[in-house]
Amino acid sequence: MNHLLQRFSQSLCRLGINKPRERIVIALSGGADSVCLLLLFKKVSPQFGIELAAAHYNHGMRGKESDEDAAFVAELTNRLQVPLFLETAPLKWWQQEPGTKMEAARRLRYDFLSRSAEQAGARWIALAHHADDMAETVLFHMLRGSGIKGLSGIPAKRGPFVRPLLPFRRKELEEFLKAEGQHWRHDSSNDSDVYTRNRIRHQIMPALLSFNPKLVETLCRNADLLRADAEFLDRECELVYGQVQQEEGLKVQALVDLPLALRRRVLRRFLEPENPGSEKTDAILEQLQKNFGRSKIVDQVGGKYLINEGGILRSYEELPWLENQDFFYPIAIPKEKNHSVRLEVPEAEGSLEVTLSTKKPVSLMHDEGPPSKPMKTALQLKAEVLQRGPLSIRNRRPGDWLSLAGRAGRKKLKEFFIDKKIPRQLRDRIPLLTSGEEVLWVIGCWTGCHDTIDQPGQDVITFQWYGKTI
């Protein structure tokens, strides 16, 4: 038994639970594992200066048996002089909780443990999972087709939750309790093979142990190796994420150039808190690789639309442009100079401010290359543009065209959108500054107007866009 206590002390040190006056709450169900955890902590607490408390949540799922568990825990902690936090779930609590009954029970239990630790001023919450639990968990995830994280099993430490018994087998914990003359409660639900975990414990594990008597140790060791790999890849993912990210999206070319392991992690990181699963993740990546230079809706994840917008992957909760809402607003030019009027354009989620002045502006570039930053949200034109006809802000119409600055001819707006790889789904939503069928400014993208301002003192009209751009 001294050897077991020594190993337990070493486990606490590895977890960093070795500071004087450390406060710990022990999750105490009354089963052999948690009772053993409590007794081990009680024995080493003088050595470490640990202050203990226990917490028991009575779900009432097994009726009288659950109440007897709570009574047993209360008697045990009273005898050991360990403070106890005890809470009983309301009747038929599972009817108000989302998810399966088992998921809801786990959620309520962990919430109670967190509240108990806060009330006790405890830094740590100790759980009684051991090596056999680890092996069964790895097999469970393997049967479900989980990836590297699932096959990493149960972490020894996650947030405030610690598991000091992971290096120990179930059998040696029970032998310790017998040597101490300490009884424990038996959970009858563990006898039923209705639950997958119980079938793994009762049927699959014994069969596999006949092939490899050291199977539990093997699975635990493999889980440790995989967890180290997963942690390394997660760190690498965080390092490259900033390189792949652009504004609120991901650069598709940079994403598909990553090694597959990082590609998957970066995409899942982008989709958080949604968890699309490995098959969905790979399907999205396959679509991006096939069409990384094209604009299209890639997929839908958790109610969100993934769209490749000309090489940038973005996520949208809704696609209002699919409703194809036409809009048209005549633009009123201020009658007095240095005054502004503002026009709201709700369909494009923005507004246009129009100012008449004689101030000499900074020259603007007019080419078909990437626009300079000011041209995305601001434009200045000679007031002579009004001679062409009334100005308006609207979305696209059949027959729209724009002038090719610096060269003869025109270009259809449709061809411009194709050349700029602007997604078809977005084109009806983009606001345009127009004069008849001529597009003077594709707001957020480009201007096709020849009216550069080259003389001081000219009357000019300044257009400033406030709101979303593509």
Curated annotation (Swiss-Prot):
It is an enzyme of class 6 (ligase). One of its GO terms (molecular function) is tRNA(Ile)-lysidine synthase activity. GO terms for biological process: tRNA modification. NCBIfam families: lysidine_TilS_C, lysidine_TilS_N. This is tRNA(Ile)-lysidine synthase. The N-terminal region contains the highly conserved SGGXDS motif, predicted to be a P-loop motif involved in ATP binding. InterPro entries: Lysidine-tRNA-synth_C (IPR012796), Rossmann-like_a/b/a_fold (IPR014729), TilS/TtcA_N (IPR011063), tRNA_Ile_lys_synt (IPR012094), tRNA_Ile_lys_synt_N (IPR012795). Belongs to the tRNA(Ile)-lysidine synthase family. ATP binds at residues 29-34. PANTHER family: TRNA(ILE)-LYSIDINE SYNTHASE-RELATED. The lineage of its organism: Bacteria, Bacillati, Bacillota, Clostridia, Eubacteriales. Pfam families: ATP_bind_3, TilS_C. The keyword Methyltransferase does not apply. It is found in: Cytoplasm.
